[in-house]
Amino acid sequence: MKAPFLVAVSLHQTNGSLTYTSALTDYRKYVMPVRPFTIALRGMYYGRFGSSAEDARLTPVFIGYPDLVRGYDYNSFDPLECGNTTDGSCPVFDRLLGSRLIVGNAELRFPPWGAFGGSSFYGPIPLEVALFADAGAAWTRQRPLRLTGVNRDLVRSVGVAARINVLGFAVA
């Protein structure tokens, strides 16, 4: 049996006081090499193009959301990380913002009760644990993507996550 996958492609045109096109490509693949372990892979690209794609009235895209690259949320930075800049910017944080982004995620998911010999697949609590690795980058036309060198834009994180399902919905 082939492993399930999902591909979403979207183009959206905005016309009015702002004119730009947004493009989204999202690819996901799920493989269960041995029950109850599942490998989940995801690659995503989003970009805004056109004359107003980087207009100051638009909120920049941000790769630090938990469903993109975990561990880089707005409150995870100390002001000391920004260094002394003359314009008040924070280069460490600014690399998470742009009009385009690319993200890759990999997870090994399993229910701990079922993985460690429990008689029931999920056990008394519908808990799922995931070991994850995330990576991503955001950029603009004025600040092109740099994947090499000292000032590269790629951010990465690894860790452990847990989810509890209630009536089929992940709640934590």
Label for each model-derived stretch:
Residues 1-135, 139-149, 153:
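C-terminal outer-membrane beta-barrel translocator/porin domains of Gram-negative envelope proteins
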